[in-house]
């Protein structure tokens, strides 16, 4: 299983983005979390198979109808960083 960190930039706070991510992650069987960051972006930590994480990345680039995603940055999550079992909203 791979673990990735996505930073989603744009108009992504105050539009139900984290709850939308939770629904997508739950449907895909992804473990991790979503949280708002002070700079206005949303951080998503996700663990799953490569194909499932690729689908999640595609979905994050679209976002829910009220969001305006400008870009999604992707990076690896170090092995020592614990990923929650299930999917949490912080």
Locations of regions flagged by a protein language model:
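Intrinsically disordered, low-complexity, mixed-charge
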Residues: 1-90
């Amino acid at each position: 299983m791979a673990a990735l960190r996505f930073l989603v930039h744009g108009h992504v706070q105050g539009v139900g983005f984290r709850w939308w991510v939770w629904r997508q992650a739950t449907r895909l069987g992804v473990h991790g979390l979503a949280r708002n960051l002070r700079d206005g972006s949303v951080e998503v930590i996700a663990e799953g198979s490569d194909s499932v994480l690729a689908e999640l990345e595609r979905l994050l680039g679209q976002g829910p109808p009220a969001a305006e995603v400008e870009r999604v940055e992707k990076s690896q999550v170090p092995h020592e960083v614990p990923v929650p079992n299930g999917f949490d909203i912080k």
